[in-house]
């Protein structure tokens, strides 16, 4: 699934292309996404100008003068710029057609979303998909104290607490494993047992891991590509534990272990990461 670095990489790639530009038409080839695309949406957006291209967690937010379009890439989606004459491929479900560019949503599993939040429905932050999201990892308020306060009384494993997204957004499966390795914390540790000092290390590790991923254009394991069609390089360059089960730890040489938590694969070094 595209995580925060992949979505932010996509946002940066399309921001300068579409912000301040008028959408000529929205082409919907397949409306049956995670939630059906509203049939009236193409008419609502035709001839309207994109005022801002934002992001909240893993959601892209395209601001128009009468509302916000919410775009989620799902499990395997990508949003890229294509030549207007390029014929759509299988799983190319939605096009945003501008005078100078076309953005195309490719989503083989159709777990993504293209939704509309009109201004009269209230602030976009109150939308049900966004209202319960945690703090952004690059928000100045996010630090070890924030995590320590959130983890108080939570018996769930620290890895699963991070994946929940209500403490801090955007730390998905890959980057949770990588951040916990950097912080030296065993992913099975109960969240409430992580000390204030270790929460400080974890907050710093999350920021550093996501910064590395952003600098590398995100991670590509299977389907993800950036707005220009380029794969992310984080996994090939930086991954210390993810999908390295049985291989030696890059720090101590101990074989990396794999386990399943909440139906998600977790990778860790049993020597470097302590409970």
Curated annotation (Swiss-Prot):
Residues binding DNA, per UniProt: 91, 109, 154
Cofactor note: Binds 1 zinc ion per subunit.
Superkingdom classification of source: Bacteria
Any Pfam family the entry gives: H2TH
Catalytic-site annotation from UniProt: 2-3, 58, 264
Keyword annotations from UniProtKB, A to Z: DNA damage, DNA repair, DNA-binding, Glycosidase, Hydrolase, Lyase, Metal-binding, Multifunctional enzyme, Zinc, Zinc-finger
Gene3D superfamilies: 1.10.8.50, MutM-like, N-terminal
SUPFAM superfamilies per the UniProt record, alphabetical: Glucocorticoid receptor-like (DNA-binding domain), N-terminal domain of MutM-like DNA repair proteins, S13-like H2TH domain
One GO MF term: class I DNA-(apurinic or apyrimidinic site) endonuclease activity
ZnF endpoints (FPG-type): 240-274
EC number(s) from the headed UniProt entry: 3.2.2.23, 4.2.99.18
BP-aspect Gene Ontology terms: base-excision repair
Catalytic activity: Hydrolysis of DNA containing ring-opened 7-methylguanine residues, releasing 2,6-diamino-4-hydroxy-5-(N-methyl)formamidopyrimidine; 2'-deoxyribonucleotide-(2'-deoxyribose 5'-phosphate)-2'-deoxyribonucleotide-DNA = a 3'-end 2'-deoxyribonucleotide-(2,3-dehydro-2,3-deoxyribose 5'-phosphate)-DNA + a 5'-end 5'-phospho-2'-deoxyribonucleoside-DNA + H(+)
InterPro entries the record matches: DNA_glyclase/AP_lyase_DNA-bd (IPR015886), DNA_glyclase_Znf_dom_DNA_BS (IPR015887), Formamido-pyr_DNA_Glyclase (IPR020629), FPG_cat (IPR012319), MutM-like_N-ter (IPR035937), Ribosomal_uS13-like_H2TH (IPR010979), Znf_DNA_glyclase/AP_lyase (IPR000214), Znf_FPG/IleRS (IPR010663)
Cofactor(s), names only, from the UniProt record: Zn(2+)
Function recorded in the entry: Involved in base excision repair of DNA damaged by oxidation or by mutagenic agents. Acts as a DNA glycosylase that recognizes and removes damaged bases. Has a preference for oxidized purines, such as 7,8-dihydro-8-oxoguanine (8-oxoG). Has AP (apurinic/apyrimidinic) lyase activity and introduces nicks in the DNA strand. Cleaves the DNA backbone by beta-delta elimination to generate a single-strand break at the site of the removed base with both 3'- and 5'-phosphates.
Quaternary context: Monomer.
HAMAP family given in the database record: Fapy_DNA_glycosyl
Stated family: Belongs to the FPG family.
Protein name per the record: Formamidopyrimidine-DNA glycosylase
